[in-house]
């Protein structure tokens, strides 16, 4: 009896710790002449609340639309145009994956996410006329993570794989398509500069509005956060920025992170497929969305499946599955938050070794004159027996990859003698001087790194 009472009390106090409301009296938001919020607080949780509040004041609509997409509610807001996104969110089973991996997330970061959620919810409570879809609220850390999960699946080209299956067009699918324009980053150490200072600069080619437009903010807490930079709608931390010790930024990269598999179905047997010497059965689901007809919301549904490989769809030629690393990771936002708080290159690099962010080039510089470039990503370790540029056989464990290359195994440059690193959405094998570039021969061709130039 006493043991049970202890467990109940422990659970009660544990829950109270992680659900305490933010004291807004500890938060100060000062806007400069450009309207950029400079946010000061005692804790990181309060800081996240302040960021959510300031961003909501400026662009509450975009934050909501991002979360609506991540929580399969966008069609409730915009009707038919939102239905494909809602279906995609359900196809990748974001809710199930996040529920299963939620306990792996650092509790300190969950507190930060909770603070951000409280800020959004309070703004919605005080501005009900600005709420787009009531069902979205209250925002929770899990709802926040579901949007991140969707966004990172799309950035891994997963949506293009899904479209190829729908359209039964795999010939035109090219994950290494070249951009006409590219974001660019560069860092210079004192080996290159003539004033003894280290520099990093970035020109990311982001839109001026929408969910992938930058929002600038300056964050200061008594728990060690001191950073200025930019973030996306709905993210509780800075995604590219500089603190008192270091700076980092991103451009887009396109190594081969995503694969499509065609299942070998058992004839005259519903949803059964061959895998090695076994017969397995697809799990069946129904995704729902809403369309408006004469102002009346009509619910529509579509079947989808799950195989041992991942999300699965049927088209006129068979059943196909999509597999990419982002489908098995939920800690990317946590990793970015920890990057915010890093104090040295070694600390920053160890955070990268979490290997939770599925892509993006990273450029870096710090006050100790370190500069660094890496083509980051969740790159599967694949069996050389197969050609990974097309549709793969989905009937053998030989194609079911489960491991990824470690951070130290990816193309990178650390403190080159040339004194500079750069990237413009192009090949990682041209990221510094000719003599110090990563050598493509050192990397498995199945990693699929870009070889083209840009800008």
Task: Write out the residue ranges for each language-model feature.
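Glycine- and hydrophobic-rich flexible loops that cap the catalytic core of alpha/beta enzyme folds
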Residues: 221-222, 229-231, 241-245, 250-393
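Bacterial Sec-dependent N-terminal signal peptides
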Residues: 1-21
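Second-shell loop/turn segments in exported
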Residues: 50, 97-111, 333-339, 444-454
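Substrate-recognition/specificity elements adjacent to catalytic centers across diverse enzyme folds
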Residues: 22-237, 242, 255, 325
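Generic, well-ordered alpha-helical scaffold segments in large soluble proteins
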Residues: 116-119, 123-126, 168-172, 191, ...
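Beta-sheet entry/capping signal
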Residues: 28, 36-38, 185, 196-199, ...
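Hydrophobic alpha-helical segments
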Residues: 357-455
């Amino acid at each position: 009896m006493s043991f049970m009472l202890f467990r109940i009390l422990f659970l009660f106090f544990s829950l109270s710790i992680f659900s305490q409301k933010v004291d807004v009296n500890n938060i100060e938001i000062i806007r400069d002449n450009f309207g950029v919020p400079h946010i000061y607080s005692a804790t990181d949780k309060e800081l996240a609340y302040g960021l959510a509040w300031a961003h909501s004041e400026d662009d509450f609509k975009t934050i909501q639309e991002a979360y609506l997409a991540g929580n399969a509610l966008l069609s409730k807001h915009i009707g038919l145009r939102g239905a494909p996104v809602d279906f995609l969110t359900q196809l990748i089973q974001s809710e199930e994956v996040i529920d299963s991996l939620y306990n792996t997330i650092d509790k300190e970061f969950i507190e930060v996410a909770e603070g951000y959620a409280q800020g959004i919810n309070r703004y919605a409570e005080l501005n009900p006329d600005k709420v787009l879809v009531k069902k979205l609220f209250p925002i929770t850390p899990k709802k926040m993570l579901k949007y991140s999960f969707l966004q990172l699946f799309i950035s891994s080209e997963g949506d293009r794989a899904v479209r190829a299956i729908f359209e039964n067009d795999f010939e035109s699918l090219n994950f290494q398509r070249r951009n006409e324009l590219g974001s660019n980053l560069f860092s210079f150490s004192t080996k290159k500069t003539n004033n003894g200072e280290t520099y990093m600069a970035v020109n990311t080619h982001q839109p001026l509005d929408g969910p992938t437009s930058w929002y600038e903010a300056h964050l200061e807490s008594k728990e060690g956060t001191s950073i200025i930079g930019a973030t996306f709608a709905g993210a509780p931390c800075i995604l590219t920025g500089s603190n008192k010790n270091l700076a980092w930024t991103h451009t887009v990269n396109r190594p081969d992170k995503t694969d499509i598999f065609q299942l070998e179905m058992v004839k005259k047997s519903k949803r059964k497929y061959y895998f090695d010497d076994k017969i397995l059965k697809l799990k069946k689901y129904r995704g729902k969305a809403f369309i408006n007809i004469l102002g009346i919301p009509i619910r529509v549904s579509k079947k989808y499946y799950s195989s041992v490989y991942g999300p699965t769809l049927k088209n006129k030629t068979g059943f196909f599955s999509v597999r990419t690393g982002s489908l098995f990771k939920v800690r990317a936002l946590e990793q970015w938050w920890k990057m915010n708080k890093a104090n040295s290159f070694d600390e920053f690099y160890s955070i990268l070794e979490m290997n939770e962010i599925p892509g993006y080039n990273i450029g870096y510089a710090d006050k100790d004159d370190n500069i660094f470039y890496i083509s980051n990503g969740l790159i599967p370790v694949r069996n050389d027996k197969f050609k990974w540029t097309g549709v793969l056989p989905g009937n053998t464990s030989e194609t079911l990859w489960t491991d990824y290359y470690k951070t130290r195994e990816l193309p990178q440059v650390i403190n080159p003698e040339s004194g500079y690193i750069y990237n413009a959405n192009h090949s990682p094998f041209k990221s510094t001087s000719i003599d110090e570039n990563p050598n493509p021969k050192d990397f498995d061709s199945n990693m699929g790194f870009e070889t083209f130039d840009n800008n």
